[in-house]
Amino acid sequence: MYKRQLYKTVRDSGYVGATMPTEFGGGGAPFTTAILSGEIGIASNMAFYMGPGLSHGAMKTILKKGSEELKQKYLPKLVSGEWMGTMCLTEPQCGTDLGLIKTTANPIDDHYELNGQKIWISFGEHDLTENIIHLVLAKLPDAPDLSLIHISEPTRLLA
């Protein structure tokens, strides 16, 4: 119960989306605000404040690289803190060397089939929000670089 009340307090303060554009419900504050307030939060409870930090990374990624449709659909709920976000990067064979990633994403109609194994997904499962947006690093066929695939609807990931 404590962590839910703490997250509600953080969410209601506007901290989660403080540096996001106002058009998505954010505060429009400079990024230095996030750095300073994040340092204070991390000093008090690093494990907890990883959640909003990971959400911030997901928001910035969608803001910078997402289509207009993705921005309109997901940023308001992430910015408000109603949803949280993660980055699914680490695999057993590549801790910090992401070039060794083996997970693939194969296009099928209007979605992708992901094949691979991710480990250590910080804040990948919790009960603080009704939904968690997962940005999954994977290889697409014929793509020269790695890609991020979003899993955005409440779903159960299968082993």
Regions found by a protein language model. Give the residues of each.
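Active-site loops and adjacent core secondary-structure elements that bind or stabilize anionic groups
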Residues: M1
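Cysteine-centered functional microenvironments
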Residues: M20, C88-P92
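A short, Trp-centered hydrophobic/proline-enriched beta-strand micro-motif
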Residues: S80-L89
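Active-site-adjacent elements of ketosynthase-type condensing enzymes
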Residues: C94-L100
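A short core secondary-structure module
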Residues: H111, N115-S152, R156
